[in-house]
Amino acid sequence: MKAAVLTLAMLFLTGSQARHFWQQDEPPQSPWDRVKDLATVYVDSVKESGKDYVSQFESSMLGKQLNLKLLDNWDSLTSTVNKLREQLGPVTQEFWENLEKETEVLRQEMSKDLEEVKAQVQPYLDDFEKKWEEEMKLYSQKLEPLRTELQEGALQKLQDLQEKLSSLGEQVRDRARVHVDTLRTQLAPYSDKLRQRLATRLEALKESGGASLAEYHAKASEHLSTLGEKAKPLLEDLRQGLLPVLESFKASFLSALEEYTKLSSQ
């Protein structure tokens, strides 16, 4: 119940983007961890699905006639891509770590603001939770006579039960809507306050003579440029690794095409 209430408050206050702030038992992932996980899942998915397509093609009549041996080349390509991913890992991680260091002060200030607002709205959340539990208890009490009547066979038609349940459900929905609207009204000032604080933080960054947003942008661009320079030799290694695969494919295809032409002319 507490998790549901906190999640609801989070939607009112800051949106789903700040949900990790309330998850005390699961520390948020760093940007690098999220990118790495997504990239790994994507690459593995493409690799497996691509290999399936290649296998299906080689098993077809046309694939057998061409005899391109794509699976052999596929394993070589996979090895090359995996090597590139391993080499790029430290470089990309360094980029994210540098960017996190540059924005550390801003993130700390925003965390303080969130903690303060969380403490201020906690009484409203507790009150909402209490009222919600009371509504669920009342709903359960109203359901008990229906359950008893059903067990005793007093309800001859299922339609009667459905009508009574529908009426109870509408009552609970209407009462819950009142509580939610009340909570939204109570939290609205704090939501506005949090947005204003964020705007103030960003404005201060613009006007400060130190770490301004322009500097953040410049530093991020510098880190990206460094990342690109470090990735160039690795991408060149990938290109060189692909050349034998492409040449093998080209030779196999031309050989198969020549063989097919000879058979067609006979």
Curated annotation (Swiss-Prot):
Residues 1-18 form the signal peptide. This is Apolipoprotein A-I. Residues 68-266 are annotated as: 10 X approximate tandem repeats. Coiled coil: none annotated. It comes from Callithrix jacchus (White-tufted-ear marmoset). Homodimer. Interacts with APOA1BP and CLU. Component of a sperm activating protein complex (SPAP), consisting of APOA1, an immunoglobulin heavy chain, an immunoglobulin light chain and albumin. Interacts with NDRG1. Interacts with SCGB3A2. Interacts with NAXE and YJEFN3. Glycosylated. Palmitoylated. Keywords: Cholesterol metabolism, HDL, Lipid metabolism, Lipid transport, Lipoprotein, Oxidation, Palmitate, Phosphoprotein, Repeat, Secreted, Signal, Steroid metabolism, Sterol metabolism, Transport. Its main location: secreted. The keyword Lipoprotein applies.
